[in-house]
């Protein structure tokens, strides 16, 4: 890469004739132009910036992976009344997203007799009167205590719409 640090410009002298004058007139001028140096960009500096961007991206991906969620469909694609998957395992604090897949009214109630001791089922469940009526509606919960949790859809529990999650 070429850089310009300074340049000198000389204007040649001019000898001109004036009417009625026999003496030589001399005009001489010189000017010095200096340009400020351009900032030097180096591969080393730009690689440093790229490296910082890569580290930031990797860190945000690791943070996001710790906050992963599992999706559980309420109603199978074939129309059956089921949680899909009906049994699964998660890590403590991992979010479960229950999503109405069919448009039938569903809810998620954790069975107070089939959850770890010390866990309040009412704090992790929907009320039995609340329903996810439309396709795409969701209910989210994060379970912190290790153990097995049984849950059901109250309108369809008799039809076998039950599930179990294990927090490892």
UniProtKB/Swiss-Prot annotation:
**Name of the protein in question:** Plastocyanin A, chloroplastic
**Record Pfam families:** Copper-bind
The cellular component terms of Gene Ontology attached to this UniProt record, alphabetical and capped at eight, are: chloroplast thylakoid lumen; chloroplast thylakoid membrane
Localized where? Answer: Plastid, Chloroplast thylakoid membrane
Molecular function in Gene Ontology: copper ion binding; electron transporter, transferring electrons from cytochrome b6/f complex of photosystem II activity
Q: Which residues form the Plastocyanin-like domain?
A: 70-168
Q: Origin organism of this chain? A: Populus nigra
Q: Which UniProt keywords apply?
A: Chloroplast, Copper, Electron transport, Membrane, Metal-binding, Plastid, Thylakoid, Transit peptide, Transport
Membership in a protein family: Belongs to the plastocyanin family.
Cofactor remark: The crystal structure with reduced Cu(1+) has also been determined.
Organism lineage reads as: Eukaryota, Viridiplantae, Streptophyta, Embryophyta, Tracheophyta
> Gene3D superfamilies recorded for this chain?
Cupredoxins - blue copper proteins
Q: Which gene encodes it?
A: PETE
